[in-house]
Swiss-Prot record:
Pfam families listed in its UniProt record: His_Phos_1
EC number per UniProt: 3.1.3.-
Cited SUPFAM superfamilies: Phosphoglycerate mutase-like
Protein name: Uncharacterized protein sll0400
Organism listed in the record: Synechocystis sp. (strain ATCC 27184 / PCC 6803 / Kazusa)
NCBIfam families in alphabetical order: sixA (TIGR00249)
Length: 164
């Protein structure tokens, strides 16, 4: 089982005029995310499914990946919203998707949450050490859906500049 944890692209700055959940990707964010998606396609990455945070900037990032043909399906997964409980989110993921035939999933979300997911799956608990740049990617291999925390293996940690 492979998981690609993908942080949303560059978004509008935080502002009292725009609720956080409504912040959109900037033109630069869309362009960079598009180039990352093109590079993933060029190296043969294919997802069975893209799961995304409900926030607009993550939804837009996921849609760019879809439009590039990296997955046949996209679903909103509320456990990827910022600040959600990491162990509960991973349990929700396992419960919802373990019985499907998916072998490669993309999870589009936010920092520090995605880094915490990666650390929980590879080290058993969040360590606060990994950082995912905007439009950056962490790739993990899990031995099975039922593996305990700490059993995952990190195979990719790349900022977007290495992909564009």
């Amino acid at each position: 089982m492979e998981l690609y944890l993908i942080r949303h692209g560059i978004a509008q700055e935080q502002s009292p005029d725009i609720p956080d959940g409504d912040r959109q990707l900037t033109k630069k964010g869309k362009d960079k995310t598009q180039r990352v998606a093109q590079r993933l396609q060029a190296i043969g990455v294919e997802f069975d499914l893209i799961l995304t945070s409900p926030l607009v900037r993550a939804q837009q990032t996921a849609q760019i990946l879809m439009d590039q043909g990296l997955a046949p399906q996209l679903e909103t997964f509320s456990s990827l919203a910022p600040g959600e409980d990491i162990p509960q989110g991973i349990n929700d993921l396992k419960e919802e998707y373990r019985h499907r035939s998916h072998r490669c999933l993309a999870l589009v979300g936010h920092q520090p949450d995605l880094a915490n997911w990666a650390e929980y799956l590879t080290f058993g608990s969040p360590q606060g050490k990994l950082i995912v740049k905007k439009a950056g990617i962490i790739g993990l291999t899990l031995p099975s859906w039922d593996c305990p925390p700490g059993e995952g293996q990190l195979f990719l940690l790349t900022p977007p500049r290495w992909l564009v």
